[in-house]
Amino acid sequence: MAEIAPLRVQLIAKTDFLAPPDVPWSTDADGGPALVEFAGRACYQSWSKPNPKTATNAGYIKHIIDVGHFSVLEHASVSFYITGISRSCTHELIRHRHFSYSQLSQRYVPENDSRVVVPPGLDDDPELQQILAAAADASRATYTELLARLEAKFADQPSAVLRRKQARQAARAVLPNATETRIVVTGNYRAWRHFIAMRASEHADVEIRRLAIECLRRLADVAPAVFADFEIATLADGTEVATSPLATEA
């Protein structure tokens, strides 16, 4: 029976910051948040922190977001390695064009033992999960049979790598949307804020909404001041959403 793949979002990279030694400025933050503040102050050369309300890094970033000076958020970035996500979900994810992606290739990686992602709505119903698993098993069996026959068909191809690639790219047509994929996603703070605003909404597909919430939790650990305006709430159906009165970019 097909193995179920749980969603997992792992932080694998984040911005470091090296303050120029000739600039008379210091801050109470480091990494991406410090870079954001530095970039903002560089615009006005306000190194002496003349405004008490923006003297701290958190205060400065709050002001940046309040006034809509979002461009300085683009200097800092975060990368996640995401597993336990369905192919159908990544089709929605990759529409966010300000992110950079590196995704598992079904042409190079065999899917004979691929896992499946249980769609929201089925995860609390064992009977429906059995139906899903049976369908996944059937499609995987068909995939395996096609793969073997296609490799035999392309036996005259002298390159073993090309032969396998040709077989896999044809056989994958029968794999379900629920097939697990794995993907590295990199985005700057502004792009991540936009993603959260769009995809953590109650109007978004539930799987990508869950992804957005998980990303938000990790982003809030990396750069609390940048994502502090988002609040996570639980709906009547038990799913979560995240909203912010300051996330106004469409």
UniProtKB/Swiss-Prot annotation:
FAD binds at residues 71, 95-97, 103, 188-190, 194. The gene is thyX. One of its GO terms (molecular function) is flavin adenine dinucleotide binding. The active site is at residue 199. Catalyzes the reductive methylation of 2'-deoxyuridine-5'-monophosphate (dUMP) to 2'-deoxythymidine-5'-monophosphate (dTMP) while utilizing 5,10-methylenetetrahydrofolate (mTHF) as the methyl donor, and NADPH and FADH(2) as the reductant. Pathway: Pyrimidine metabolism; dTTP biosynthesis. The keyword Nucleus does not apply. One of its GO terms (biological process) is dTTP biosynthetic process. Keywords: FAD, Flavoprotein, Methyltransferase, NADP, Nucleotide biosynthesis, Transferase. A motif (ThyX motif) lies at residues 95-105. DUMP binds at residues 92-95, 103-107, 172, 199. It is an enzyme of class 2 (transferase). Homotetramer. Belongs to the thymidylate synthase ThyX family. Residues 7-233 form the ThyX domain. Pfam families: Thy1 (PF02511). Its cofactor is FAD. The lineage of its organism: Bacteria, Bacillati, Actinomycetota, Actinomycetes, Mycobacteriales. HAMAP family: ThyX. It catalyses: dUMP + (6R)-5,10-methylene-5,6,7,8-tetrahydrofolate + NADPH + H(+) = dTMP + (6S)-5,6,7,8-tetrahydrofolate + NADP(+). Binds 4 FAD per tetramer. Each FAD binding site is formed by three monomers. This is Flavin-dependent thymidylate synthase. CDD domains: ThyX. The keyword Repeat does not apply. Its EC number is 2.1.1.148.
